[in-house]
Amino acid sequence: MASEDIAKLAETLAKTQVAGGQLSFKGKGLKLNTAEDAKDVIKEIEEFDGLEALRLEGNTVGVEAARVIAKALEKKSELKRCHWSDMFTGRLRSEIPPALISLGEGLITAGAQLVELDLSDNAFGPDGVRGFEALLKSPACFTLQELKLNNCGMGIGGGKILAAALTECHRKSSAQGKPLALKVFVAGRNRLENDGATALAEAFGIIGTLEEVHMPQNGINHPGVTALAQAFAINPLLRVINLNDNTFTEKGGVAMAETLKTLRQVEVINFGDCLVRSKGAVAIADAVRGGLPKLKELNLSFCEIKRDAALVVAEAVADKAELEKLDLNGNALGEEGCEQLQEVMDSFNMAKVLASLSDDEGEDEDEEEEGEEDDEEEEDEEDEEDDDEEEEEQEEEEEPPQRGSGEEPATPSRKILDPNSGEPAPVLSSPTPTDLSTFLSFPSPEKLLRLGPKVSVLIVQQTDTSDPEKVVSAFLKVASVFRDDASVKTAVLDAIDALMKKAFSCSSFNSNTFLTRLLIHMGLLKSEDKIKAIPSLHGPLMVLNHVVRQDYFPKALAPLLLAFVTKPNGALETCSFARHNLLQTLYNI
């Protein structure tokens, strides 16, 4: 390290925050590769008496630097809180496990008794979980109360490793007469899916002391949701349940509602964007009406709930004196339904509690019926472990005996919700196929899958591939529904491949303009147009990681894309796993 760099580092360290037993290097942007780089950090640690909390967020720590920092921690037995989120930026994934192993060994040697461990926003994947597995099983974590692993890309494998480690920690600590009493568990955006969630649910059921569970955006469907619901029922102290942006369907909604009936301490329920639909919402409303005396927030936004079910939910919160927010935005109430909902809440003197309804999707008489069919399809898929077998079985189950080759499947009699009883009532309905314009107006994975294999042809036919702005619009709408679910992922990438292959092969298509406009809409490049950036970059980044590896992608665009994805940006920081994967791919082009 050059002398001027050392001087700069020393100046940065001089501003290090020291308060209440806490030593903070948070957000210093330190690049600690070697032992020499970490020399001043180590000095600060060694000279700090009574160190209880160490903040390393917002720096980047290499293997060698981690080893010497760990050595310094071996004498810090009073350390209780490790705030180590976002501290491997720019590191190869292979560097992270050995760095974590070293740090964990330092804590174990010190005889520390941790209360909080935060490793969020480190894109370490399943192998990274192996890096702190031994720490979790050790006496250093027998006292752990808060475990935060948000946005780490653990996947199913990492979820299973984590669950086993927590179970072992509980077993060992129980043998010493002081069972692990974990209170807060955070693991959003980790692609846990059903198997990972189910494994963790088993661990939660054994632990039994949870007060907060945050697991949004994990691709969990109703089998995983049901497993979690069963585990939550054995955790009577639960106050916060955040499963935002997973796919409950009605089956998961009903299962979770049954658990809510048994809990008395719950204050916050966040099931937004979970597709509980009307039947699930009515079941949850029943649980709210009969209990949950401390409820402060109920989020059922963007769940495909219709008017009558939404009114049932509103009526259920009438006696919740502590309620601060009811969010039913983004459902299918219609203008009249929104007015009725506001009137109901106003009649309870709770108008201020109701969140905005500005994104209501409008009343659609056929949408509920389509949703019922989606539930059946999703359940058929989830019953099989192999993705390819899932798709084949689903096709077979949907195929009626009279179906001929090349014909559309006949629409059977379906059920819609009886608004009075909340029970399904049989009706006959005519087919309501989804067309591309419907999908592009309100994109969702279900609508994309309903288009079937023809989506690739349709998107090419109905998009002006000579116009970069129109291609960007179609690209972002398809990418927005990207999920790790095999069928959704395949449908998204097939549609994107067809669109981009046609666009890049068009002689009048300006590739540079396309990338520029894409970066603007993603909020990575400023524009005089004052275009509002899309809300989430996860889908577009995951899709771009696929696109840049295809033969049709002009490799001359890679350096420009790399430059903007590398630049610091708040929107990118919330998608560190997807960003890391794309950067790795771009570096290798």
Curated annotation (Swiss-Prot):
Sequence segments annotated as region (Disordered): 357-436
Job description of the protein: GTPase activator for RAN. Converts cytoplasmic GTP-bound RAN to GDP-bound RAN, which is essential for RAN-mediated nuclear import and export. Mediates dissociation of cargo from nuclear export complexes containing XPO1, RAN and RANBP2 after nuclear export. Required for postimplantation embryonic development.
Chain residue numbers at which the record places covalent cross-link Glycyl lysine isopeptide (Lys-Gly) (interchain with G-Cter in SUMO1): 8, 526
Positions of crosslink type Glycyl lysine isopeptide (Lys-Gly) (interchain with G-Cter in SUMO2): 8, 15, 279, 454, 526
Summary of the tissues where the protein is detected: Detected in adult brain, liver, kidney, intestine, uterus and ovary.
GO biological process: cellular response to vasopressin; negative regulation of protein export from nucleus; nuclear export; protein sumoylation; response to axon injury; signal transduction
Modified sites of kind N-acetylalanine: 2
Protein name (record): Ran GTPase-activating protein 1
Subcellular locations according to the entry: Cytoplasm; Nucleus, Nucleoplasm; Nucleus envelope; Chromosome, Centromere, Kinetochore
Effect of substituting residue 521 to A: No effect on UBE2I binding nor on sumoylation
